[in-house]
Regions:
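Asp-based phosphoryl-transfer active-site loop
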Residues: 2-18, 91
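An N-terminal domain-start capping segment
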Residues: 12-19, 132-149
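Alpha-helix-centered segments that form part of catalytic cores
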Residues: 138-170
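Short, Lys/Arg-enriched, disordered terminal segments
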Residues: 1-2, 33
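Conserved small/polar residues in nucleotide/adenosyl-binding loops
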Residues: 177-179
Length: 180
């Protein structure tokens, strides 16, 4: 007997407009009414995936960062695979030699080494154009997108300040880099 259905989010549940179609939503609701558990697997972080699913009133388990973290329907973390703490300083040193922003996804949420203004510029000049290229049929409100990213990020002047808070690091995502 089937007890759990697992689905990818991007390109599977989400259509080319990055939306869940009415037909797919009805199927999800029917599955859940039958008592089957639904697990959404995504490369996205938990907060972005949860926000999207909440917009469609879908309550389910979420495996984010490609399965590195798993959360239940209540938002409780069931599993996490972190980057070993002893490796983080060297990684930050290497990434710090690159002329780009990088996003550090941790138990504190999204962390950025640098200023809000610099990160906003990075989002505007690199991330938004890349999203528009990848999803040409999707309408993206650049100002809202950037404001939301800035509101949800924690900013640090350097890696030592971040590491002094002892967060568990899940993923470090580096932008287009020009390393020295």
């Amino acid at each position: 007997m089937i007890k759990l259905i697992v689905s990818d989010l991007d390109g599977t549940l989400l259509n080319s407009k990055q939306q869940i179609s009415d037909r797919t939503l009805r199927a999800i609701k029917q599955i859940q009414r039958k008592g089957l558990r639904l697990l959404i697997n995504t490369e996205q972080n938990y907060f972005d995936a949860k926000k999207l699913l909440d917009a469609y009133d879908i309550s389910c388990d979420i495996a984010c960062f490609g399965g590195s973290c798993i959360f239940d329907t209540s938002g409780d973390q069931l599993h996490a695979s972190y980057i070993p703490t002893k490796r983080i300083p060297e990684m930050l040193r290497i990434f710090g030699s690159c002329r780009t922003f990088y996003e550090i996804h941790s138990t504190r949420g999204l962390c950025v080494l640098g200023s809000k203004e610099g990160y906003a510029n990075y989002l505007s000049s690199e991330v938004v154009p890349a999203l528009r290229e990848e999803f040409p049929s999707q309408t993206l409100d650049e100002e809202s997108y950037i404001c939301e990213r800035l509101e949800n990020a924690h900013f640090y002047d350097n890696g030592q300040l971040l590491l002094s808070e002892n967060p568990q690091i899940i993923k470090i995502k580096i932008g287009r880099a020009s390393c020295r």
